[in-house]
Structure formats: C-alpha cells, structure tokens
Amino acid sequence: MSNIKDIENKHISVLLTELVDSIEIKNDKKNIIVDSTLGMWWHASKMIEKMNSWDIFVWFDADIKNLELARIRLEEVNKNKKVEIHLINSNFWNLKDELEKIWIKEITWIYYDLWLSSLHLDEADRWFSFMKDGPLDMRLNKTKWKTAADIVNSYKDSELREIFLKY
C-alpha cells in the first residue's frame, strides 16, 4: 500500500490535537521544531500548518519509505507556508550529530513518538507483520544491516542466544 490517501484514510493518529496544541509557536523568533520519529506524518503536517514561514522543521525517520511518502505529503502542506524543512534518514539516536550537520545547535521543541508506524504492520514486505506472510526482514532501512532471515539462518546458536538474552 503506497497510495498516500489510502494510507491516510486507514491511519488514526494518537494524541495529535494534544501535541499540536501543547506546542507554543513564537511569532517574534525563529522556531526550530524536531519530529524525531516521523512515522505517519500526521503530527508533522499539523505542526507545519501551525508554524511561521521563517521557522525550521526537522524530521527524522530511520525508514526511508516513510520519509519518501511523508515528503510528498509535507510538500503539499508546506507549499503555501514555505517553512524550511529538513528530511533526515536516520535514527533519533543520531539526532545531535545530524542536527550539527545542518548547523542547528539549539531547538525550540522536540517530540518523539516511540512506537512503530502502522505501515510496518500493514505491509508484509515492509518490516514485520504478524498479520500477513512476508519476508523475515525487520530492518527500518533496507539498505543497511543484515535481514533477520540472514541472521537466523547464518549465526551460530551461541550468537543467537547472546542476541536474545541481550535484547
């Protein structure tokens, strides 16, 4: 499922109004807002609607497909606003380093949605769906790391045991 309208019609965003209402946008300074786990872009699109044209919005997601879909949606939302937007394909663990790369040293607001995207469950080939058959992958970025299938089928029992005990 990669049709944006189909995805938006199926997804229900949690705490959307509460989050957006809780963030105060200053009109006398540049607001820099970071969405550290973009996911389904609802929070980001509502936040951009609220921001000033001179503000900066930075969004992170380790899943490149989420970023590609979100870019399309957020370009629509931002076409009249002209908020400066930065798309970063990285995990929020790298937030400080990634922000430094784009010369951002201080932020106004940051928020995290520490769950996974419903896309990961809805599409069997995306990540890990327990509702549909699909490859055993379990990577947010399919260009990095080994698949879960590669690990399960090539690691020694002792290595697998160590992974399961550690994580």
Regions found by a protein language model. Give the residues of each.
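S-adenosyl-L-methionine-dependent methyltransferase catalytic core, i.e., the SAM/SAH-binding region
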Residues: 1-167
